[in-house]
């Protein structure tokens, strides 16, 4: 941690070079948050009142970086990388580096040892294995190495000797290969930042993390020639970047006519000793952890990410624009990857429900039906529950050679705990929604369990057929589907039974349109031979009345697909009248 003297030197340096810090603000070092800014007395700043003004000459931008790396002037796409490399050279290079002596008081307050997970021990990082943060870290580091190597090649810079073995990991693999996170951890942990050279990967990673936690978008400078579409190009804003980040805090940054970048808090009133915060944008806890190294369980912008891999042909046929909804990630022609953010405030995004409703829709259905939505909820619940189980089963793991730091253990536990909380909210929302949809459509449904209880003659026949004394026996003996098929054909053959009119109608629609192939008959032959003609002879009062041919069962099987939803809680088949469901997306 930096010292109060280093902090005071930085503040004095800024003020000596034209910066203004309102006298009502003081900076000090705290045990929990490091450098923090506090308001000394109660006051109400005006919306356009600059509490901090910093001359443009104190900012670290791509302009200074190009003074050091002039050959990068034509590499517009690498400007942010060049600025980060310049910071590495300022921090870890020799005193001869352009402007190093000028920026020294500021560089001294940039912490050498950072709290971000990229600098955790291997054992600490391995406790994130299987999480979204783990995958994000792996992908970020692989992307960062690619960017770093490309930058060095463009600028004709030699890599540090300490990276020789590390670089071999990427020279042996193709560009598309992904180097495991464990190998990154081993290299990063094996490098001491205080002894590292400016052209080492760990120095570049340090600079990347400094930018992630402190940089401001260059577009706010309002300079001519600034690519306003490139929001990734950042710069460092001394003094203001000492303010801690907090979501929901209203702030403004604006360049004035004197080329001073002004910080204006939009908080209406401060009490004495209130902390003065900056806001880099309302961000999730995942970004708080990766960018700043902290976690806030009260963060209303937090989410748990649900990632789905689906066949591309399946997704392309859906009437949902996942690009527009922001859920599309990649598509390699075979597999489409979609991601959904689940939040406590919105545990079930409408587009996610729509996706599973469409995935559960039959080809014969033009739009999702009540049945397909209920079935889609079951499938989605299964996916979310599987993810939830992963978080529930988590236990801290460590090897005998490494000790986990208490504050890191706390962060890891909070990560699992809060993801578990969000996923629990999603499963509860799905359960409540499913019950509501079923309740609203109960008058258009027919429970097979109720049928079994009321149709004594049919139920008694199943005692002879399956040895099923009660409904539960049909489940335990794994003959529920066979019983369904037998009952549907019985219903169709019983002309005097007015029950299940919508079932009879669907059966007729299927019977009139179905084309039965030889393969269909062969598939049903074992089932048919298992029961007929035996049932016709043993229980003729049911199984000899009407048409009990194999075709009837093939038609009944398709009718089941269109009408039956199996309630997961008790494996109860429920017939649902075909009825469109408005997804409202």
Swiss-Prot record:
Belongs to the class V-like SAM-binding methyltransferase superfamily. RKM1 family. Present with 5170 molecules/cell in log phase SD medium. S-adenosyl-L-methionine binds at residue 280. It comes from Saccharomyces cerevisiae (strain ATCC 204508 / S288c) (Baker's yeast). This is Protein-lysine N-methyltransferase EFM1. It is found in: Cytoplasm. InterPro entries: Efm1/Rkm1 (IPR017119), Set10/Efm1_SET (IPR044432), SET_dom (IPR001214), SET_dom_sf (IPR046341), SETD3_SETD6_MTase (IPR050600). Its main location: cytoplasm. Keywords: Cytoplasm, Methyltransferase, S-adenosyl-L-methionine, Transferase. GO terms for cellular component: cytoplasm; nucleus. Residues 23-281 form the SET domain. S-adenosyl-L-methionine-dependent protein-lysine N-methyltransferase that monomethylates elongation factor 1-alpha (TEF1/TEF2) at 'Lys-30'. Its EC number is 2.1.1.-. GO terms for biological process: methylation. One of its GO terms (molecular function) is protein-lysine N-methyltransferase activity.
